[in-house]
A protein has these predicted regions:
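Generic detector of short, well-ordered, non-transmembrane alpha-helical segments enriched
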Residues: 163, 236, 583-584
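Disulfide-braced loops of extracellular cysteine-rich modules
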Residues: 157-168
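Non-catalytic accessory regions flanking glycosidase/transglycosidase catalytic cores in CAZymes
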Residues: 1-156, 172-281, 286-579
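Ser/Thr-rich, Pro/Gly/Ala-heavy low-complexity intrinsically disordered linkers and tails
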Residues: 582-590
Length: 590
């Protein structure tokens, strides 16, 4: 399986035929030249005497309904990066309403009512987007769509076609600009092709789970929203149906019961009956870099009588808000211990509540269709034990009794270019002397560390939850070559990390890693499928959507391993095959 990278204009993956869905939300600027009025220090034109309103008037779907005086608004479809990652050619921008659209990073080819054709060069590494500089009152620009060049073969919705890549004998290329094609296709065929091998898709980033502000269903994008900053639930179900893959849903940590019920209802009704849905509360709730780490105990600590007072004795005391960090030291102060205990309790309690609400919505099919997940830290499996071993608050049953799988993230390469006794260029120069030397060390020492993560998590389950039959799976995994702290921008670290990830040797290292996993766990989900490399990580198995998969060592390793080991655990059902017809030519002569 795989995590799918988040929706962002900085991504070199374009999941949807309509590129407007993955574009950046509107940026408020002004006619004097300010790009973003929310950053007044970025440009003198953002400041007085120039008017620079930050409020954007929107309709129910998020399209701009009117412009304020001196206001312009911008969206970026693709942020600058390596030239050619966004395919060259003519892009068709369609819209209802009337106004003035200024292209950015593209040249206008033609314009008629409701449509602009723009050409994008393969040589550009600039930002690509457009700006609204005027809107006709009473008839604003809306229902904006951006359709790429090319199309999809009429006999294979996973096959992209254009003049250079025809469909072949007996098939026709349906252009994305043809009537109804973009809506029916929804997903770009190259995106579908890249994800064909994965039988489990984790939507943590697609749902914008980390530090999510989402509370109610109305806060979450719908199919008609201008931008899919978070991908609609109906679209998640549609992708699973199209690929015959299982889905992994991350419920936002602030979600109300009503929103949980709404999520469950959509998935029950829209997702195929013969595939599984994995349910997880939040993501990495233990991780202090995400707001859920303190917002979960802040929400639930007042309900724990023995902890409530202690949770108030935090880094910002006296304001009645629990579990707040000191803005200067990032410390919770004396509230560290009670807030941690509140997190452990609430994490288990709320997970069980969400599991039970999904069960109630799914009814008799719940145990066949739903996989209940508790996910915690690979380096500290005792945290997962603490969450699962206790009774749910006020109940006679344990959290473990309501849990099907325990998920860890057994990354390899976590010790390189990190502070606090890491394996770094300044203390282990020989490791970084060449890419081959680095890979030698990664293949031995790096894999040994991740193997220990896997074995320790498995041992924790065997020692504590054998009776419950909780299976060990991964919520993330793969290489973790990213500099931390002062090593983030270290040139030696980044050179070796880039070269190692692109080296053909990485394929065999991954194969060994996945064999280690097979001995210690069941479902594996790579983090993540497609994404550009940066100093903050080389997470993608592919660097960009159009990459030749034969040049991608990690992708080859994962798909090759899956081919040889399609299902190695009890109850596994391989995806990718459509349901058989009741009667076929082989059934009693039809």
């Amino acid at each position: 399986g795989a995590n799918i990278g988040g929706i962002s204009d900085f991504s070199d993956e374009f999941p949807f035929v309509d590129l407007m869905k993955s574009a950046r939300d509107w940026i408020p600027g002004n006619s004097a030249g300010c790009f973003d009025c929310r950053e007044p220090g970025s440009n003198p034109t953002c400041n007085a005497p120039n008017a620079c309103p930050v409020t954007i008037n929107r309709d129910a779907n998020g399209f701009v309904s009117s412009l304020l005086p001196n206001q312009v608004v911008t969206t970026i479809v693709h942020a600058g990066g390596t030239p050619g990652r966004l395919s060259a050619g003519n892009y068709t921008l369609r819209f209802d309403g009337s106004g003035t659209i200024q292209l950015l990073g593209a040249s206008q080819v033609s314009q008629v009512a409701g449509e602009i054709v723009a050409n994008i060069s393969s040589s550009t590494g600039n930002n690509i987007g457009f700006r609204l500089t005027a809107i006709t009152g009473g008839n604003p620009l809306r229902n904006i769509r951006i359709l790429p060049p090319g199309g999809v073969c009429n006999n294979d919705d996973h096959r992209f076609c254009d003049g250079a890549a025809p469909c072949g004998a007996g098939a026709t290329c349906q252009l994305f600009t043809a009537a109804g094609v973009a809506d029916a296709q929804l997903f770009h065929p190259r995106f579908l092709k890249n994800h064909e091998p994965f039988r489990l898709l984790r939507f943590m980033d697609w749902m914008g789970t980390n530090s999510s502000p989402i509370v109610n269903a109305a806060d979450y994008p719908s199919a008609t929203s201008a931008f899919w900053t978070r991908v609609p639930l109906t679209t998640l179900a549609a992708l699973g149906n199209r690929l015959q893959s299982d889905l992994w849903i991350n419920v936002p940590h602030k979600a109300t019961d009503a929103f949980v019920d709404a999520m469950a209802t959509v998935l029950r009704d829209d997702f195929t009956l013969d595939r599984k849905i994995y349910i997880e509360y939040g993501n990495e709730n233990w991780n202090g870099i995400f707001s859920q780490n303190v917002e979960i105990p802040r929400q639930f600590c007042p309900g724990f009588a023995d902890l409530a007072a202690g949770c108030q004795n935090d880094g910002v005391s006296g304001n009645g808000i629990a579990c707040e960090r000191d803005p200067n030291t990032f410390s919770l102060g004396a509230a560290q211990a009670p807030c941690f205990q509140a997190l452990v309790r609430a994490w288990g309690d709320r997970s069980v509540q969400i599991f039970d609400r999904f069960d109630a919505i799914f009814g008799a099919s719940a145990r066949q269709r739903l996989i209940r997940v508790i996910a915690a830290q690979a380096a500290n499996p005792d945290l997962g034990r603490q969450v699962m071993v206790r009774n749910a608050t006020g109940q006679a049953f344990t959290v473990a009794s309501k849990t099907d799988t325990y998920a860890s993230a057994p990354y390899f390469g976590t010790d390189y270019c990190t502070p606090d006794n890491g394996i770094n260029p300044d203390n282990n120069a020989s490791v970084y002397a060449s890419t081959e030397a680095f890979l030698d060390h990664l293949e031995t020492s790096g894999l040994a560390v991740s193997r220990g993560f896997m074995q320790n998590s498995k041992a924790m389950l065997n020692a504590n939850f054998a009776a419950e039959g909780i299976r060990h799976i991964s919520y993330e995994g793969g290489q973790h070559l990213a500099g931390i702290g002062g090593f983030t921008f270290n040139s030696t670290c980044n050179l070796r990390f880039d070269e190692a990830n692109r080296s053909p040797r990485m394929e065999q290292i991954y194969r060994t890693y996945l064999s280690d996993w097979k001995a210690n766990g069941d479902e594996f989900t790579q983090f993540y499928s497609v994404g550009r490399y940066s100093v903050f990580g080389r997470w993608g198995t592919l660097e960009f959507q159009d990459q030749d998969v034969t040049t991608a060592a990690k992708y080859r390793a994962i798909t090759g391993h899956t081919t040889v080991n399609p299902c190695h655990w009890v109850g596994c059902a391989q995806g990718g095959a459509l349901p058989q017809l009741l009667f076929t030519n082989g059934f009693e002569g039809n």
